[in-house]
Amino acid sequence: MRYQITSDSTCDLSPELLQRYNIRLLPLYVNMDGKTLRDGLDVRPDDIYAHVSAGGGLPKTAAVNLADYVRMFTELSAQNDFVIHICISLDFSCCYQNARLAAADFDNVYVVDSRNLSTGHGLVVLEAERMARAGMAPDEIVAALQELTGRVEASFILDRLDYMKMGGRCSAVTLLGANLLKLRPCIEVKDGKMGVGKKYRGSFEKCLVQYITDKIGARSDLELRRVFITHSGLPEETVQKAVETVQKLQPFDEICVTRAGCTVSSHCGPGTIGVLYIRKAEA
């Protein structure tokens, strides 16, 4: 059967992975300086950082609109036996509602809420492609993905909280305390929502190693097919330290290093990195 897996740009999959697995993306929008820009096409995270550093304020992100979805589904549904679109969590954006509305006019278009963001969302996209390539029927894929979303573990550790403060996600007092005490909070996605997990103290590299160890060390319940290390713009040596730490702790078949897109970057700012993976299904 001919199929097409599609997603929103918030999945943060690299161009190489998109090409390898023939994933089609629709960009979210970033409103900056009175202009509406397409995530990953007209604007990139470094543009946002430069804009904020210049005193321009934090840009706002906006969902893929209904017309964009209708246009893509019209094209792809005619070319394929089925299309499966995976969205960023309903709790982060109205992409899912818009995609569902657009898909209602097509018998062979299916929409799935990833219940995640960034490469937590991306992991669901790649699993959808793997299932479709294996010959599963679209109804079976959708059911399998809905079960899978509860097993994706996505988290990030932040080196700085100024972007969280600008976005109204932490207070000035919290920011001051974190800076004084050298606290690096872990942001976790649970049940489709973002929350604060453990707080680490010390140098960023020390906290990074401890964070990764806490997440994947001494565990036998992880699917080892793939892990993502996703960051919002960090020095190569810091990213490599994360890779080496993961390699020491778990024998993943594939370690994918990716840059976070505009959504995560505008929420968390530079100096953010996470490990994202899937738990095994319970027996």
Give the positions of each predicted feature.
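Mixed-charge interfacial surface used for oligomerization/domain docking
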Residues: 4, 10-24, 28-31, 82, ...
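N-terminal glycine-rich anion-binding loop in soluble enzyme alpha/beta folds
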Residues: 4-65
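Glycine-rich phosphate- or other oxyanion-binding loops that anchor nucleotides, phosphorylated ligands
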Residues: 55-57, 63-90, 97-98, 142, ...
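Short beta->alpha junction loops
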Residues: 63, 114-115
